[in-house]
Amino acid sequence: MQKISIFLILIFCGTAAGAQLFQPVHYPKTEFRNPLGIPISLSANFGELRSNHYHMGLDIRTRQRVNLPVYAAADGYIYKIKVEPFGFGQAIYIRHNNGYITLYAHLNAFQPALAAYVKKRQYELERWDVFLDVPAGLFPVRRGDLIAYSGNMGGSMGPHLHFEIREFPEDVNLNPMLFGLPIPDNKPPVVRKLAVYDRDRSLYEQSPEFYPVIAAGKHYELAQRTIYTL
């Protein structure tokens, strides 16, 4: 009986500790605004697999145009600026009062005061490609302030704004869709077929069994109501 009691206590303590360790993170839902002045429409989402990396932000369409105004998503100050021929092209990093960083990339131009500062630093450093640490307080921004104009610079395949939210100081990328941005989600997924795998075998040792499905109102069901023996 004593052993059983000790065992139950250990289970309870382990469960309680695990619950405290894996508490859900609640991200602010109202502090960040749409960085553009048009409704958000995505051409690429967070976490998509690319040839050699994961896509760590949102690609927001700019109606196949450049030079749309880009706005600060929240209060803070510009603390880094990047200019490079590939990658982000021209980019702005804003550190916010709430402990996050936002990144705006593939910009066509900076707002005039910022552009003058970048040009001055480029001449001082005698190089075009720069990654500048901007002194804190030199370029404070308020939510909605104009900071740049959208573009197609760097490693971009078409006009858009690449937008990221990161955690400071770890510089960890977070999914911007966790922060309550007004992103329409009105296209339900289309299910074409059901694939069944044998869990006792490796995925590399088998091909799935496919079963046709049909739409039935707001859900899908098997096209043939048959009992399958797997």
Feature locations, PLM:
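Intrinsically disordered, low-complexity Ser/Thr- and acidic-rich flexible linkers and loops
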Residues: A115-D133
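Surface-exposed, glycine-biased beta-strand/turn segments
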Residues: G18-A91, R95-I101, F110, W128-V130, ...
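Histidine-centered catalytic micro-motifs
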Residues: G158-I165
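Residue-level signal for short segments within beta-strands and strand-turn junctions
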Residues: H96, I165-E167
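A cross-family detector of function-defining hotspots
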Residues: Y104
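Sec-dependent N-terminal signal peptides
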Residues: I4-C13
